């Protein structure tokens, strides 16, 4: 019996809603990255984008454990000497919680064209409302 290899045209995609309120950022992000990649499906093929669409709500209520709010830094560099800018995650989560969540998921996905394609299926919202009711998303309960 031959192994099944998924083709891009045959992949059926579902829509899921994940509530991130009160849950650790890394744990939610790792499960969302797995769904975006399609690893929860028996037809997973590494070289095909076979993941589902994910809507994350309540991104502003996500939690960082321990002292990470003050000690973990978001780093960006201007490529000039001395151009490293560091921002504590406390400020990032106050100003742009959607960006913090998307960045955590992006770093868990493959780099390259396929990873960027997977990331486009992620929709993150600060509050509890989203505008994807027409897609009839299923509520997804996370494992932990």
Swiss-Prot record:
<dbReference type="InterPro" id="IPR036899">
    <property type="entry name" value="Ribosomal_uL13_sf"/>
</dbReference>
<dbReference type="InterPro" id="IPR005822">
    <property type="entry name" value="Ribosomal_uL13"/>
</dbReference>
<comment type="similarity">
    <text>Belongs to the universal ribosomal protein uL13 family.</text>
</comment>
<dbReference type="InterPro" id="IPR023563">
    <property type="entry name" value="Ribosomal_uL13_CS"/>
</dbReference>
<dbReference type="GO" id="GO:0022625">
    <property type="term" value="C:cytosolic large ribosomal subunit"/>
</dbReference>
<dbReference type="Pfam" id="PF00572">
    <property type="entry name" value="Ribosomal_L13"/>
</dbReference>
<dbReference type="GO" id="GO:0006412">
    <property type="term" value="P:translation"/>
</dbReference>
<dbReference type="GO" id="GO:0017148">
    <property type="term" value="P:negative regulation of translation"/>
</dbReference>
<dbReference type="GO" id="GO:0003729">
    <property type="term" value="F:mRNA binding"/>
</dbReference>
<keyword id="KW-0687">Ribonucleoprotein</keyword>
<dbReference type="GO" id="GO:0003735">
    <property type="term" value="F:structural constituent of ribosome"/>
</dbReference>
<dbReference type="InterPro" id="IPR005823">
    <property type="entry name" value="Ribosomal_uL13_bac-type"/>
</dbReference>
<comment type="function">
    <text>This protein is one of the early assembly proteins of the 50S ribosomal subunit, although it is not seen to bind rRNA by itself. It is important during the early stages of 50S assembly.</text>
</comment>
<comment type="subunit">
    <text>Part of the 50S ribosomal subunit.</text>
</comment>
<protein>
    <recommendedName>
        <fullName>Large ribosomal subunit protein uL13</fullName>
    </recommendedName>
</protein>
<keyword id="KW-0689">Ribosomal protein</keyword>
